[in-house]
Amino acid sequence: MPRTPKNQNLEQNTQTQSLTDLVYPESTGIPVPEYLGTVDKLPDNTEEVPQPKRRGRKPNPKTKARKEPALEQNVQAETEPEFQEKKQPVDGIAAAEKRLAEQYGVANIDAIAEPIYTGEQNYKPAESTEENAFVSENTSEAVIPQNGDMAQAQAENQGEVATDQNADPNAQQQGEAQAQNGEGQDDRRFNNQNGKFNKFNKNNKFNKNNRNNRNFQQQEEFVDDSATLPAPGSEAILKAKENWLKFRKLSMSELQELAVQKEVDFRRMRKQSLNYILQSLENEGNIIYTEGVLEVTPQGHGFLRMPDQNYQTSADDVYVSQNLIRKFNLKIGDTIEGLVRTPRDQDKYFSMRRIDRVNFEEPDKMRRRVAFEYLTPIHPEEKIHLEWNETEYSTRIMDLFSPIGKGQRSIILAPPRTGKTVLLQNVTRAIAKNHPEIILITLLIDERPEEVTEMRDIITDIKEKAAEKGIEIKAEVVASTFDEPPEHHTRVANMVLEKAKRLVESQKDVVILLDSITRFARANNVVIPHSGKILSGGVDANAMQFPKKFFGAARKIQDKIRTVKNEDGTISEEVQKNGSLTIIGTALIETGSRMDEVIFEEFKGTGNMELVLDRRIAEKRIWPAIDVFKSGTRKEERLLTLLEQNAAWNFRRGSQNETETGIMENLLKLMSKLKTNAELLAVLSKPKV
């Protein structure tokens, strides 16, 4: 409330002011008889109370008038000379009240007048009775209240405060809010939820808030509108998935040609955004289908990273709200399929509209899954057959002398230029042909770009040939070439590892082909904060933790046996197949680098299968350059039959006196005559005399 000027005296007694107002028709509207007359104003004997001096800058009267205009107007009205002349002395009030009560035939003036109140009391309107009905009908102005009750009285005059049942119960609260802010003027601190006046998310003049790490303004939360969308698995969804796969294979120039045909402005559009826009025009109901791997941010929301972009961040990534993440118990690395919503007015990204599948299963199953760390690892027991072509001798040799099982932790020790890349390509073809149920991920770190393109062409060719036979192959290539920073190498490896873990939690068999562990460890040595403890070769003491974590994640999960009660009342046991994670990684040796030797020594005893490539065999242009004597698998009796074990043992015993080159030449000659390993086993199982 503004300060009262010193040259204007206000009435200090609030009760006296209220009683005086009852007599005048200007304040209450009650007709006053002529014989009452008027009372002369007594001299003002109130003393002026000195106001304390205010330090600092003087307040701007215009600013205060804007904040509390109603209060300022009432104060000015009270301080006017005309208003001061209307004041009645205290002595003439009693006689006036008595004559007024006799005129209306009541015992007390309180029966016809509203109760007297002060600014410190809570205002309560008088009850509606027959005696004061005349007063309420002819009343035009309310009694001027004091301080905060002014807004309440104004609300009453406007009909906001009523005594009937149809009155607004929140009118009093609204009046109080108006009194605080000045005629209902909204406080700007409560208007902007994301602006600089927000109490819990204050931003500076650059609209940044580095203190609380809330620079990213989350998009509008998920709204369940699945009732208006086609059901999962319907023809519309299947067609949308086909269009997504079709547009995904097209290049940017081909997508732009389609955009021109459909009259779409593709300027400033990236490939993924243009893909979504063309999908919405092609699909029924303008629905958009997508698939990606979830990455959860520290703020709680997430984004879908695309394998085509090697799981790197992009402006076209799909936004996943916190509600969806909490609803389905989603984690980083989950493979999500569903429908996408186009950006709204203030949205920056495409957002997830509905989740249809998670890790190729129903989303509700993810709520009951067991974390990867709590699964029980065992030795591999199910063999992965690598024999797929009679002319590919490398996989036939591996299938017999160094078998690989589901959950194997395999390491290929290869000097430079010994054919490790070709060997991985043949293993990829063998797994895709013999085990289409396995999810295959090829991870290339610090490799040459042309090798990445070659591997992707191989995967595409495998998928197309399998699709012609009606078989769906789940395989992909994720790469980070040598011209990218080390941070990209570690990020890609982490996303692939988390994706594989989530698939294993969903009882899936996953195989990761890693090329190579050595380059992966080099990149991690550059990225991590140095501990100050340097090993030989310049390797930090903590540099091998993440590569070991990656390589050590390979395991076979123990199957779960549970009892099931049949319909006839008998109890039987049911075996629930769990998943497995197989990692086949390559390690560089004989490179002349001390760091590579240290990395090799760290991983030497961690794998349970080793395949050694010999440089001397490769120099003589003999492929594959496999050292049969140094290669082998731990617990191979769990993977090989007794016939296969005897055949491998007889061949090794009969070739002890020969060189590595001679052993490989003899084995290749024998395989060229025999088309399958079954025929080879029949020959090798016979002991030499």
From Swiss-Prot:
Recorded superkingdom: Bacteria
Bias type Basic residues, positions: 52-65
EC number: 3.6.4.-
Database matches in InterPro entries: AAA+_ATPase, ATPase_F1/V1/A1_a/bsu_nucl-bd, CSD, NA-bd_OB-fold, P-loop_NTPase, Rho_factor_ATP-bd, Rho_RNA-bd, Term_rho
One BP annotation, GO: DNA-templated transcription termination
Stretches with biased composition (Low complexity): 170-183, 191-213
HAMAP family: Rho (MF_01884)
Its biological purpose: Facilitates transcription termination by a mechanism that involves Rho binding to the nascent RNA, activation of Rho's RNA-dependent ATPase activity, and release of the mRNA from the DNA template.
PANTHER family xref list: TRANSCRIPTION TERMINATION FACTOR RHO
Identification of the protein by name: Transcription termination factor Rho
